[in-house]
Amino acid sequence: MSRAVAQAAETASTFRDANEQLEARADELGLGARPTPYLCECEDGRCTELIALTRVEYEEVRAYPKRFVVVAGHQEADARIVQEAPRFTVVEKIGEEGKLVAARDPRAR
C-alpha cells in the first residue's frame, strides 16, 4: 500500500471522527431535523469547509463505513461517486483505502 493511500484514508477518517462528535453534540442540543454543519470529509487535511446536512442525510452516509460526504467538487478523481447533490457529494472509498477507512469506522469499534 502506498503512503499516499494511507494518508488519504487517515485524513478522511479524521474528519469523519470529528463529524461523529458534532453529531453527538447536535443530539445533545436537540437540533432535531434542522440542518447541522458538518466538516467536509475530503482528503485535503487543510480543508475547513462546512456542509449543512440534516441528520437524516448524515445518517444515510454513515450507514456505510466506506462512504464520506464532501463539498461538491472536493472529490478525488478516482473516487466512486455514490450521490451528487447541489450542496454535497457522497463518495465511497474503494480498494486498500476502503479497507483502511472501514477499519477506522468509529461505529464499528
Residue ranges and their predicted role:
Residues M1-R109:
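Polybasic/polar functional segments that serve as interface/processing modules
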